[in-house]
Amino acid sequence: MLKRRRTFQAQEVGELDFSEELLELGVLIGSYRTARGIKQEDMAKLLGMSRITLSRIENSWLPLTMENFFKMAAIFEVRPEYLLQALARVTQRKWSRKGED
């Protein structure tokens, strides 16, 4: 028997809240930058943005574009999916604690 896939209505998708995941992604990016000894100002220059803009991304005040996400992965010398897997591990632990697996 095939499982029926649920289709989302546009309104439902618009109501989804990913703020926790975006916060975690910003923190993750900041952690990788710090662990690699890259100053915020230096990374911002590599990305073609101001240090303030990078700070706002790392603090989830501004969204991270896919283009900048891929650039960051290149700067960190990791595959983009590695960062996404790290994000998935963090959010999975949080969801498991909430009983939402």
Where are each of the predicted segments found?
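N-terminal flexible/basic segments that precede or flank functional cores
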Residues: 1-27, 31, 35, 79, ...
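Residue-level signal for the short linker/turn that defines the boundary of a DNA-recognition helix
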Residues: 27, 37-38, 64-67
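DNA-binding alpha-helical recognition surfaces that contact promoter or target DNA
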Residues: 27, 31, 45, 56, ...
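Residue-level detection of the helix-turn-helix DNA-binding "recognition helix"
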Residues: 34, 48, 59-61, 88
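Alpha-helical residues within the helix-turn-helix
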Residues: 34, 45, 74
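Short alpha-helical DNA-recognition segment
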Residues: 37-56
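DNA major-groove recognition helix of helix-turn-helix/homeodomain DNA-binding modules
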Residues: 67-82
